[in-house]
């Protein structure tokens, strides 16, 4: 069994995270329950920042907040000196409520609405990552109306395919995101952006995908980007002050996953950039990256209570838990795989393979297939590891199931940062049927 961060087995044979007994957490807050190891998040943030310091380059590390968003998480990111990557008005509003410095906000998204752009311009955010011509024109119009200026990066698709799931690949030419380099879209976008007085083009952004273990794709993306940067300098006098290379750094979910230390990704990126800078006699831009999963993914653990069991002789043994695709959509959406253990009996040896089923009314609601476990009983607490990214963020109310609470743990203390939804919350926005009165 592989433990992440501060996770360990305590004297009671229980899983402990951040110095807190997870069985006690389950008893106190109920299940399902998300538990975040804050010390591990701090360590990862420090590793990314130190990696850039070791390379001697100016950099911004922006937390990709779609991985997990809430007021407390945004406040922690600010405390750690991270910028914040948001992709919606809702995430921007959460950042405002958290008291985050707006100058550290980078606003992404392939279809920002007029209302969202106006909200961001009025808030004075640090940078828009412009995804398409529609947005470029809309932003220019809004800035003109409000007599404001906006810093932007142009998101480009470098034509690099990361070795990952199709749904989380974004750097190839056939993608809903960004300006294509090959067709000339990106060149036209640079020309248009430079012609607008209210827009300040800082540089370009590239993101090739997610859950990436190799550095080759990042290096190839840098090389392709600089091929065009050289041309843009010659033809348009544009040289970037910022180069954003995105995120996508992989983590270990299951045995066989082989992520690199974060310093390896940074080192290879910077090496590639410095090589291009020297070759083309350009100035070194500030480097931005956007880790999300790699900051919070393996810091999160979900606790469930085991309920019903079903055994099909010589076929499969099912264990059903009190959560499922309503709190972790990734197995159904991406065929994502996870590891787990009985939090209340961690040291006991497995007796067989069990498949963990969620409680939603869907045959595809399976959290884990073939998990080695001891003989599991009703009311045992199952811990599923590495659920810190895209678990709560994708949580939903399918089957009218309330979303779970979230607890931060550190140095023996636990803090509730998101309350459990109640049934009352599920109908709070509902309106009753109005019956027409017959005359």
Curated annotation (Swiss-Prot):
The record's keywords, sorted A to Z, are: Amino-acid biosynthesis, Decarboxylase, Lyase, Lysine biosynthesis, Pyridoxal phosphate
The pathway to which it is assigned is:
Amino-acid biosynthesis; L-lysine biosynthesis via DAP pathway; L-lysine from DL-2,6-diaminopimelate: step 1/1
Q: InterPro entries from the entry?
A: Ala_racemase/Decarboxylase_C, DAP_deCOOHase_LysA, De-COase2_C, De-COase2_CS, De-COase2_N, Orn/DAP/Arg_de-COase, PLP-binding_barrel
Q: Known catalysed reaction(s)? A: meso-2,6-diaminopimelate + H(+) = L-lysine + CO2
Q: Name the Enzyme Commission number(s) assigned to this protein.
A: 4.1.1.20
Please list the residues that carry the modification N6-(pyridoxal phosphate)lysine: 66
Give the record's family classification: Belongs to the Orn/Lys/Arg decarboxylase class-II family. LysA subfamily.
| Subunit text | Homodimer.
Stated name of the protein: Diaminopimelate decarboxylase
Please name the source species: Halalkalibacterium halodurans (strain ATCC BAA-125 / DSM 18197 / FERM 7344 / JCM 9153 / C-125) (Bacillus halodurans)
Q: Which gene encodes it?
A: lysA
């Amino acid at each position: 069994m592989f433990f992440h961060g501060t996770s360990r087995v305590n004297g009671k044979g229980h899983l402990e995270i951040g110095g807190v007994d997870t069985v006690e957490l389950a008893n106190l807050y109920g299940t399902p329950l998300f538990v975040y190891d804050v010390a591990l998040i701090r360590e990862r943030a420090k590793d990314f920042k130190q990696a850039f310091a070791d390379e001697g380059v100016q950099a911004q590390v922006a937390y990709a907040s779609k991985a997990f968003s809430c007021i407390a998480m945004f406040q922690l990111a600010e405390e750690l000196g991270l910028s914040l990557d948001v992709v919606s008005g809702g995430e921007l509003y959460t950042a405002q409520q958290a008291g985050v410095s707006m100058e550290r906000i980078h606003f992404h998204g392939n279809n920002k609405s007029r209302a969202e752009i106006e909200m961001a311009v009025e808030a004075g955010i640090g940078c828009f990552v412009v995804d398409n011509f529609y947005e470029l024109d809309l932003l220019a119009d809004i800035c003109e109306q409000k007599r404001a200026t906006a810093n932007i990066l142009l998101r480009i698709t470098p034509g690099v395919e990361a070795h990952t799931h199709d749904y989380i690949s974004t750097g190839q030419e056939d993608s809903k995101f960004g300006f294509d380099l090959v067709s000339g879209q990106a060149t036209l976008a640079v020309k248009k952006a430079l012609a607008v007085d209210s827009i300040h083009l800082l540089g370009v952004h590239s993101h090739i995908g997610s859950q990436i273990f190799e550095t080759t794709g990042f290096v190839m993306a840098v090389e392709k980007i600089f091929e065009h940067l050289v041309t843009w300098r010659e033809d348009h006098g544009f040289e970037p002050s910022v180069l954003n290379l995105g995120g996508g750094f992989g983590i270990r979910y299951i045995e066989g996953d082989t992520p690199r230390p974060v310093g390896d990704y940074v080192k290879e990126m910077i090496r590639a950039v410095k090589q291009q800078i020297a070759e083309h006699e350009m100035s070194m831009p500030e480097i931005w990256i956007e880790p999300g999963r790699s900051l919070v993914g393996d810091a999160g653990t979900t606790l469930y209570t085991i309920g019903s069991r079903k055994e099909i002789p010589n076929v499969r043994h099912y264990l059903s838990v009190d959560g499922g695709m309503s709190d972790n959509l990734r197995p159904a959406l991406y065929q994502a795989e996870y590891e787990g253990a009985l939090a209340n009996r961690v040291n006991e040896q497995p007796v067989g393979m069990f498949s963990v089923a969620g409680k939603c009314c869907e045959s595809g609601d399976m959290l884990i297939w073939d998990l080695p476990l001891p003989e599991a009983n009703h009311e045992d607490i199952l811990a599923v590891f590495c659920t810190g990214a895209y678990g709560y963020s994708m949580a939903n109310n399918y089957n009218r199931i309330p979303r779970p609470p979230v607890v931060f743990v550190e140095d023996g203390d636990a803090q509730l940062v998101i309350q459990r939804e109640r049934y009352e919350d599920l109908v709070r926005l509902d309106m009753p049927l109005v019956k027409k009165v017959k005359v």
